[in-house]
C-alpha cells in the first residue's frame, strides 16, 4: 500500500483509541498551560498559577491512564514508544509548572528584549504542539508523516538557535541583583526552551511506530 495513502487501522479498539485520545489531551493541556503562563507573566495572578499546577496534576492522572490502557492494548511492540511519548508530554507539563513557579520568585519583570524572545519561543512551541497533533492524526488515520516530522525538527532547531545565539548571549551580559536571581532566571528559561526538545522526542517515538507499519 502506498505510504502516502496508508491507513494504520491499529487504534480502532477502545483501549488503543483511548491511548491516542489521552495523548491528544496531554497536548491540549500543554497548550492551555502555555496560554496561562503567558497570562501569568503579565499579571502574577495567584489564581492562574494554581490553575497551571492543577493542570500538571491532571496530566499525571492522564499519563497513568495511558499506562493502564497500554497494558490492555494488543500492540506490545508499540507499548514502549507510546509509554515514552506519554512520559515526555507529562514532562512538558512539569516544565510549564516549574517555569510558572520560578517566575513567581523573580523580583524583576523581564525587559522588552527578553520578553519578546521568550514570547517567540512560546509561539514556536505552540506551533510544534499543533504539528505533533497532526502526527497523531497520521498515526491514527494514515498519511505521510515525513513532512510533519521535518517541520517539527526545523522548529526545534530554530528554538535552539534563538536560545544559543540570542537569549544566552544576552543573559551573559545581563546585570542581576544576586546569584540566586540570575539562577532563577536561567532555570525559568531552561524550562521553557526544553519543551521543544520533549516535543521533538515525542515525534521521534511516534515516527518509530509509523515506520513499524510500513
From Swiss-Prot:
Pfam hit, one: PhoU_div
Q: Where are the transmembrane segments?
A: none
Under the heading InterPro entries, the entry gives: DUF47, PhoU-like_sf, Put_Phosphate_transp_reg
Similarity remark: Belongs to the UPF0111 family.
Name used for this protein in its record: UPF0111 protein MJ0629
